[in-house]
């Protein structure tokens, strides 16, 4: 393809009309649910039996799926969207059709509703951290 200009001659701050559709996104907090899901897994993995972002179900800017096995042994597939987290299925990588489960704003709230063992593990971790802070403050 021949061009009648040298791209290096274009000014650095050239604004193209095609970019106008992206101006509305400037300054907004656009989330990538895949990254958000990974952060959730890393945050609470200590308090569940197993947890990982699904490699089978779609992971996109607006949705991600997390497989979790609580300490009691029950498995769930969780859906993460802007609305929050909800149980989407009762097996890894499985979405139950017609399931209308409640959305939770945080993974802590969701796991607290599903797993007494999570509640205990989270409480113990919190207590250990507070004791460590107390020891550090007395030193």
UniProtKB/Swiss-Prot annotation:
Subcellular location: Cytoplasm
Main localization category: cytoplasm
Gene Ontology BP annotations: regulation of canonical Wnt signaling pathway
Organism superkingdom: Eukaryota
UniProt key word Cytoplasm: yes
Pfam annotation, one family: GSKIP_dom
Entry GO CC: cytoplasm
Protein name: GSK3-beta interaction protein
Native source organism of the sequence: Xenopus tropicalis
Gene symbol of the encoding locus: gskip
């Amino acid at each position: 393809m021949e061009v009648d200009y040298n791209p290096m001659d274009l000014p650095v701050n050239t604004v193209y009309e095609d970019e106008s559709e992206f101006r509305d996104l400037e300054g907004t907090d656009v989330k990538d649910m895949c990254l958000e899901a990974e952060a959730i897994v890393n945050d609470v993995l200590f308090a569940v039996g197993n947890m990982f972002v699904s490699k089978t179900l779609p992971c996109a800017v607006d949705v991600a799926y997390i497989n979790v096995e609580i300490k009691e042994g029950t498995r769930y597939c969780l859906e993460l969207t802007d609305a929050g987290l909800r149980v989407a299925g009762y097996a890894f990588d499985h979405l139950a059709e017609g399931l209308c489960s409640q959305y939770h704003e945080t993974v802590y709230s969701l796991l607290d509703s599903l797993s007494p063992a999570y509640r205990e593990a989270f409480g113990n971790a919190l207590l250990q951290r507070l004791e460590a802070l107390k020891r550090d403050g007395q030193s």
